[in-house]
């Protein structure tokens, strides 16, 4: 969509961000116990903040552990609420994959609608046509924000096809029967579902009308090897997107900028910082994404450390994330001086189409971290594949990473947020 990638006046954007932020700060001081305490602890008077840059200098980061502690001290919803509890009508919770414990989030109708508007940007940037496209949502009926906001944002604009708890086979048949043109799911599930297309399922590629696959929930949609494999399986264009329960839908991929996520800066004040110093990195450098929510006012977050590792690239006046979300800051493992992220391992593995599933095991050997790659392959595949993968890993990371065959069907399959790295 042309206007999604057109150049914008960054000064005008900053003015709009400050207008929203100024009102937010004053509201939080009066109504939000969590942030009122945080302001006092930092010696910060919201009325004394003189603009976006001043806010960044004075406001400390918000950490996930602070939010967890607040929920534990004031169960079940904590004190991070800007409205009376009776004003909230929507409930979602995090998956708990990064914190070990799900965290509940509540929204008012106004806050919810603000997030739906962000999701509509995702659809518009992917050039979906209202009244024509049919979106198939391959998600179960769960408490996760991504499905509900994506589904409700599409309602009233596109024909929406929910799949609930259907099996993968039933989902493929439903997509073929009703002519779904867009698939919305995680990258892992797009691969898993796509690999069923063919004689075994009775659903051929020719019987499907899918032309676009919108993925979210985990890194993958912007990893070239994962992206190309999904596109080959579906004969469709992949569009990446990312967001999180704590803040909402954050970014979109436009048709004109494949492999790059554009942050919705009208809804978020975004920074990319060095996680050690907290200082903003230069254009073209990598760092941790930090977000301040500007429109989800029922439970806004100020300078929230997302833990997402990204590459900052300014494009046409907008902040974009080159390569999407590259990984998690807390998932990084340092092996022999080399920083390794799970997404980097996946980028290598996905170059080998015979690998059906994989898992990385991390263990201590003589007080040092070591990793090993487990792979599942069809029984008729030569074991020489292990040597090929080991060679590719060595070329990529300049170290030997052992590869071992796992028993067929022994590695977990995932529909939502695949976890392929475990400590043993």
Model-derived features: positions:
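Generic structural signal for residues in well-ordered beta-strands
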Residues: 160, 238, 270, 358-360, ...
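Conserved beta-strand termini and adjacent loop/short-helix elements that scaffold enzyme active sites
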Residues: 163, 241-243, 273, 363, ...
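Structured loop/turn residues at beta-strand edges in well-structured enzyme cores
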Residues: 19, 178, 208, 304, ...
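AMP-binding/adenylate-forming catalytic core of the ANL superfamily
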Residues: 183, 290-399, 416
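Conserved AMP-binding/adenylate-forming
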Residues: 220-222, 226-316, 331
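Active-site phosphate/ATP/adenylate-binding loop shared across adenylate-forming ligases
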Residues: 2-3, 64-234, 239, 247, ...
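Nucleotide 5′-phosphate-binding alpha/beta core
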Residues: 1-125, 367-372, 380-396, 402-415, ...
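Extracytoplasmic/secreted proteins and extracellular or luminal domains
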Residues: 176, 204-206, 282, 302, ...
């Amino acid at each position: 969509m042309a206007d999604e990638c057109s150049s914008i006046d960054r000064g005008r954007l900053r003015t709009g961000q400050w207008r929203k932020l100024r009102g937010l700060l004053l509201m939080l001081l009066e109504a939000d116990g969590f942030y009122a305490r945080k302001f006092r602890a930092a010696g910060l008077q919201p009325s004394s903040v003189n603009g976006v840059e001043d806010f960044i200098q004075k406001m400390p980061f918000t950490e996930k552990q602070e939010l967890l502690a607040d929920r534990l001290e004031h169960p079940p919803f904590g004190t991070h609420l800007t409205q009376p509890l009776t004003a909230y009508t929507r409930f979602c919770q995090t998956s708990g994959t990064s914190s070990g414990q799900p965290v509940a989030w509540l929204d008012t109708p106004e806050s919810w609608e603000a997030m739906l508007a962000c999701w509509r940007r995702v659809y518009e940037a992917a050039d979906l046509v209202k009244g024509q496209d049919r979106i198939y949502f391959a998600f179960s009926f769960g408490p996760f924000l991504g499905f509900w906001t994506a589904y409700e944002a599409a309602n009233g604009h596109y024909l929406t096809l929910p799949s609930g708890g259907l099996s993968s086979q039933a989902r493929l048949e439903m997509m073929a029967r009703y002519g779904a043109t867009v698939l919305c799911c995680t990258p892992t599930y797009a691969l898993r579902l796509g690999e069923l297309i063919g004689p075994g399922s009775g659903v051929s590629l020719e019987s499907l009308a899918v032309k676009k696959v919108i993925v979210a929930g985990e890194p993958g949609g912007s990893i070239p090897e994962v992206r190309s494999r999904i596109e080959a399986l579906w004969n469709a264009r992949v569009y990446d997107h990312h967001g999180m329960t704590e803040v909402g839908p954050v970014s979109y991929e436009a048709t004109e900028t494949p492999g790059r996520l554009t942050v919705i800066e009208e809804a978020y004040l975004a920074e990319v910082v060095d996680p050690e110093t907290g200082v903003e990195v230069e254009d073209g450098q990598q760092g941790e994404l930090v977000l301040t929510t500007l429109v989800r006012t029922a439970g806004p977050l100020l300078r929230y450390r997302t833990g997402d590792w990204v590459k900052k690239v300014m494009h046409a006046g907008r902040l974009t994330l080159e390569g999407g979300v590259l990984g998690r800051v807390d998932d990084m493992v340092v092996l022999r001086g080399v920083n390794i992220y799970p997404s980097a391992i996946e980028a290598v593995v996905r170059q080998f189409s015979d690998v059906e599933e994989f898992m990385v095991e991390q263990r201590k050997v003589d007080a040092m971290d070591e990793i090993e790659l487990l792979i599942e392959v069809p029984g008729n595949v030569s074991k020489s594949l292990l040597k090929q993968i080991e060679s590719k890993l060595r070329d990529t990371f300049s170290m030997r990473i052992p590869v071992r065959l796992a028993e067929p069907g022994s590695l977990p399959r995932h529909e939502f947020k695949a976890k392929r790295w475990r400590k043993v």
